[in-house]
């Protein structure tokens, strides 16, 4: 019996998943991203350093039998990339990619997996929006190469707008959390009432009421907000990224500046990519801070941006070419002499190099599932024919 949210990936699905993983990683490598493969387990002081409460809850903990110290089984690979960059990233721009299993204590959503195959890419050391645009371009290049059955819809946000307003209004932690909860619940009537008692309350309400209209959002904010460089920059970044997605990738884009689910982790642009009517995003990404680098005199966090996805979520939206499954005629080869057998093995090797799946049967009843072709001996020549 398997736990809820844990499934076997079998046969053609397992083959498809591995093909997709390999194809996507090769795409990332071809764009200049360095492949890394961190371990499944780490001591929690490094694995969960600076982690959100949600990530801590999602992480299984175990006791190291060698040292007695607490270890965690990774629930997300990104914190491991932060550690790797802090030790090896230097002070220049660094690009990383990865693909590996992660394990969650709880599933994401009603039918979510607790064992995703997480694949992602990240850029460290570049504070400019050019890095976010590059990642978007890489993501769409990857997905377009798969010829997916449906188009991706992207929902953009920018946590820096709300963060800066909260700083200007000197909001307490409880007021900040209350606003975030009201935003998440889309509760405009209660939000309006709460905002009446807050400094810059009209701005916080405007984010929820008009935040989707990014072209006109700045003009609806208060004069203080309109003159704040951080808010102006954030809105400009959203407009530029939205325009790039629409022009370069003909992508449907929506804006939600009150999408703050990663508020305690993200620092700027955030995006979720959805497909069809699925409620859980296929891909998540955004800006965040790396660790303070051991190699930098300033000891400042490295700015970073990245995205990740669960490769198994792609299975339902992609198709591979139907495999050619070949069975060698058992009766024809079981009594072959060594010279004739060697010729057969050479032909089998040639077929396998061409991508055919060739089974050399052990008995007459050894027939592969889904067989499409048979390799038979006709007039002393091995010939391939469909069945």
From Swiss-Prot:
It comes from the Bacteria. GO terms for molecular function: histidine-tRNA ligase activity. Keywords: Amino-acid biosynthesis, Cytoplasm, Histidine biosynthesis. GO terms for biological process: histidyl-tRNA aminoacylation; L-histidine biosynthetic process. Signal peptide: none annotated. This function is generally fulfilled by the C-terminal part of HisG, which is missing in some bacteria such as this one. Heteromultimer composed of HisG and HisZ subunits. This is ATP phosphoribosyltransferase regulatory subunit. It comes from Psychrobacter cryohalolentis (strain ATCC BAA-1226 / DSM 17306 / VKM B-2378 / K5). The lineage of its organism: Bacteria, Pseudomonadati, Pseudomonadota, Gammaproteobacteria, Moraxellales. The gene is hisZ.
